[in-house]
Structure formats: structure tokens, C-alpha cells
Amino acid sequence: MNVQIDKVSKKFGRVWALEEISLDLAPGQIVGVLGANGAGKTTLLNCMAGVAAPSAGRILYDGERFHRGKMELRKRLMYLPDFPLAFAKMNLLEHIAMCMRLYERPDPDVEKVAALLEQLSLLPLTGMPFSAMSRGQLYKSALAGMVVVDPELWIFDEPLASGMDPMGIAVFKREARAAARRGRTVVFTTQILEIAEKFADRICVLDHGGLRLNRQMGERRGTGDEGDLEDLLLRLRDPEEKA
């Protein structure tokens, strides 16, 4: 999916959480959005997913303007927030079945779903209500739903700090990379620069609601630019830090 974020701003009261963010994201890309707490990362994802409406600007998916009422467009994306929302009494199998209905997908391959749940250490928990699961188990359950649905746009808020165990993070990275190879667009937020540098095809840095960096990573890996990026993040977190 082609994603165009065109001068998007978002205001809460008197505070601008986002100020004129413009980005063009191509199909097949994994995009890491970095920034300190309060930089605007989650607000940007909320606007992209239709959870919040921009105060100004627009978001286009494949050239069509998006808003929360565009249900057909919303069926082409899926969003995993920092703490996935889940019906307390629902279990994992019911969640996957609900996702398939909402996204109008055919019945999945049972063996492939079972293998995925086994890799996520969720297979013994398929009948457990979400209210009894840990945060990491909830995030892995939501990840399983996204993998099975396979939307055109995958959006993750802080998957690397979601409480998932190392295997869960490994499955996230593997499935996100496989999705990108299928032409999906993957966007995730993080504060972990080292992983983002190695995993993302593009890195965007937000600070106080503004876009400070938009860098294609592929041709820059191993060129020494990594230190420049780390220095930039440190300066944004500590304005007194000198170059």
C-alpha cells in the first residue's frame, strides 16, 4: 500500500502533538519511527489507523483520502497499540475468528495457524480468556491475529517493548519482513535505535511533534552513519548535548 502523510498536524487543547508531518511510504518497506517519550509517535500511528483524526493535513492510502469512517480502507490495515485492546472474556481462537470475519477473510489454514501459535507459545493458551493473560501474551495474541489476516498496512506501537519474550520478538521480525516481501507496508515505533537500524528499511525520527529525520537505511548500513543517527537522538533528548 502506498501511504502519503501530507502536512498532518494534531492538537490536544493548546498543545500540538504533531506539526505538519509529511511522509511518503512505499509498498514493501519496513518503517521505524523513533523518538523520545512524548515525541508524537503514538499520535501519528493513531491518526494513520483512524483512532484519532488529524487537526490539519490529510492521509492518503493508494491515493484515497483516509478517515475513520472509510470502512473499506480500514479493512486494508491493522493496528496493534502499545497495550492491545481485547474483550476480557474472549479467548485467542475467538479473537482470530472475529478478525477473519471483520476483515472478510476466508477460513485460514489450520495447520499454519497452529504452527504460528506454537512458535509464539500460545497453543496451550487458546482457550484462556484474555483477562487471564499477561501483557506480552496479549500482544502475541494480537500479533497472531494480524499475521493470519495479513492486511496491506501493518501498524505496531512499541512492539519491541510490548512485554513479548525473545521468541515473540523474533516472530514479529520474521513475519514483518515476510509481509514486506509480499508488498505490505509495515510501520512500527520504537526507542531502541540498535534494532531499528538493522531491521528497518527507513527510519523516521520525531521530536516534539516534528519530523527531524527521514532516512532510507539500505544503502547507508555499514557506512558509519549509524553514529550520526545516535548523536542526533541524544541531542534531541538532551538539547544541552553538544555535537
What are the roles of these predicted feature ranges?
Residues 57-68, 72-73:
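Conserved ABC transporter NBD signature motif
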Residues 97, 101, 108-125:
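Conserved ABC ATPase "signature" region
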